[in-house]
Structure formats: structure tokens, C-alpha cells
Design a protein with these regions (language model features):
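Non-catalytic, surface beta->alpha helical segment in thiol-disulfide oxidoreductase systems
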Residues: 124, 129-159
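Acidic, low-complexity mobile loops and tails
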Residues: 42-58, 68-73
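Thiol-based oxidoreductase modules, predominantly thioredoxin-like and allied folds used
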Residues: 77, 88-96, 100-114, 122
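Structural signal for short hydrophobic segments within the conserved structured cores
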Residues: 43, 104-106, 137-140
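Loop/turn elements at helix/coil->beta-strand transitions in domains of secreted/extracellular proteins
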Residues: 70-73, 101-104, 133
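N-terminal targeting signals for export/organelle localization
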Residues: 1-51, 159
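Short active-site neighborhood of thiol/selenol oxidoreductases, capturing the structured segment around
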Residues: 64-80
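Hydrophobic heptad-repeat coiled-coil signature
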Residues: 82-85
Length: 159
């Protein structure tokens, strides 16, 4: 019994003597997660970037929709708390890799970019906006499968 008690005391002493870098480790993990997220997320687009690069609806209501890159665009309007949005994210990321150089993909956090979401009457998430090279965009409200999105993108790329 004395030996068990001594072993417990020895282990506790060792535990107390080890440096506590838990806060530093937590900061490193958080930084690492942020780096991973940067590489595994679609680029965000702000209200101003949308006006500058896709469609300046504030100043010219007759302007045609276009992306300065000349490619079709897919925009994911989402919210961080939305489970279907989180489920949709990896599919969109895979499709953005598949159509790299052919279609531009962006995401819009509807809580951070309320003005942009309100401009298109986005009231439900997820909502995907598909903008062809020419013509009017169209919206898909609610979760849709990767296969369905792929079919829509194939149509966008045709024209």
C-alpha cells in the first residue's frame, strides 16, 4: 500500500513539474485550423467586390451580368450555423477543383454580407446563384446534391 501511495505521489510531482504550454498549444492548433480552412474553402466575395467584378446593379440597371474573368460564376449564399450549408461546402469545393479555370466559385456569409444577400432577396440558406456567361442568373434555394450542381454547371460551361 505504501508503494502505491509513493508511486501516486511521484506521478503527481512529475505532473506538477512539467511546463504548462496548453495555451500556446491551443493557439498553434487554432492557427493551424485557420490555415487549413483557407486552403479548403471557396473564396469569399464582398458587396463591393461583387459590384466591381460581376454586376454593378447600384449604378447601371441595364448592364448585363458578366464576370470580369469571362467565366460563369457560382455563388454560395450560406450561414455558419446552417447544417445543409456545411454539408454543401465540400461538394462545392470538389466542383471548384473540377471546373478550375472554367467556372469561378465564391461564397457569401449572409450574416456578414447582409447587404449583398438582401440585394437578391436571399431569405433561405443555402442558396446557390448560377451566373452564366451571358443572360440572367438563376437561384437554387435549399440543399441540392453535388450531381445536380454538376449538371447545372455543365450547362453553364456549354455556352
Amino acid at each position: 500500500m505504501k508503494n502505491i501511495f509513493r508511486a501516486i505521489i511521484a506521478l503527481l510531482s512529475l505532473a506538477c513539474c512539467t511546463p504548462n504550454d496548453g495555451v500556446d498549444s491551443l493557439a498553434r492548433v487554432k492557427s493551424f485550423k485557420e490555415e487549413i480552412n483557407k486552403e479548403t474553402e471557396l473564396p469569399s466575395i464582398t458587396y463591393k467586390e461583387f459590384l466591381d467584378n460581376i454586376y454593378d446593379f447600384e449604378h447601371d440597371s441595364t448592364q448585363t451580368w458578366s464576370n470580369k474573368s469571362g467565366r460563369p460564376v457560382v455563388i454560395d449564399f450560406y450561414a455558419t450555423w446552417c447544417a445543409p450549408c456545411k454539408k454543401l461546402g465540400p461538394s462545392l469545393l470538389e466542383l471548384s477543383d473540377k471546373y478550375k479555370g472554367q467556372v469561378d466559385f465564391y461564397k457569401v456569409d449572409t450574416e456578414k454580407e447582409e447587404r449583398l444577400a438582401m440585394a437578391f432577396n436571399i431569405s433561405s440558406v443555402p442558396t446557390l446563384m448560377f451566373i452564366p456567361k451571358e443572360g440572367e442568373p438563376y437561384l437554387s434555394v435549399g440543399y441540392i446534391s453535388k450531381g445536380e450542381i454538376n449538371q447545372i454547371i455543365k450547362e453553364l460551361v456549354k455556352y
